[in-house]
Amino acid sequence: MEKKITGYTTVDISQWHRKEHFEAFQSVAQCTYNQTVQLDITAFLKTVKKNKHKFYPAFIHILARLMNAHPEFRMAMKDGELVIWDSVHPCYTVFHEQTETFSSLWSEYHDDFRQFLHIYSQDVACYGENLAYFPKGFIENMFFVSANPWVSFTSFDLNVAAMDNFFAPVFTMGKYYTQGDKVLMPLAIQVHHAVCDGFHVGRMLNELQQYCDEWQGGA
């Protein structure tokens, strides 16, 4: 199981078409960037309710499918080398009302939604009441999802002091709301410019919207 979870391919930076971009955005122009969209979840939410699924794991699974579909969202520095993980797994926040704190919990990704939902449900049942920051422990090949369901927003930025080798995407979901006949949800994503450009984020967000429009409840 460990081999499956942590497999990767090394990138030969000297032969990589993004060599100059990577070196620039990891050194003299080191930066991450954030983008916030108002995602139309009208059809997705309707299907979630129709199939009596929970919104959070269903949406996390869609994000995980997209992260695993594109190598730019699976990159990391490991032992001084740039690598592409064979797969990445969602690490998501679980809120604790009694302490007003949260935990970060990860679940192994599977293409099949129902199999992923089973794993997610087991993880939440086992670790959901644990107040530790990482109750299940930590793995290297994760991307991050945070939920802020108490407020809607039009912009959201993460300000981390040292992001030089942190390439994992970070998503933040806001409170969804009705606008006309649509249900919209704020969604922010932070990526590292060394491995991911605006084109890549734009393509992913367009695919995400299509997934939400066409999602069939994991069938």
From Swiss-Prot:
Acyltransferase is among the record's keywords: yes
GO molecular-function terms, A-Z: chloramphenicol O-acetyltransferase activity
An example Gene Ontology biological process: response to antibiotic
N-terminal signal peptide: none
A Pfam entry, by short name: CAT
Record: active site: H193
The reaction(s) this protein catalyses: chloramphenicol + acetyl-CoA = chloramphenicol 3-acetate + CoA
EC nos: 2.3.1.28
Stored SUPFAM superfamilies: CoA-dependent acyltransferases
Matching PANTHER family: CHLORAMPHENICOL ACETYLTRANSFERASE, SLR0299 PROTEIN
Family designation: Belongs to the chloramphenicol acetyltransferase family.
Protein task: This enzyme is an effector of chloramphenicol resistance in bacteria.
Quaternary state and interactors: Homotrimer.
Protein name, per record: Chloramphenicol acetyltransferase
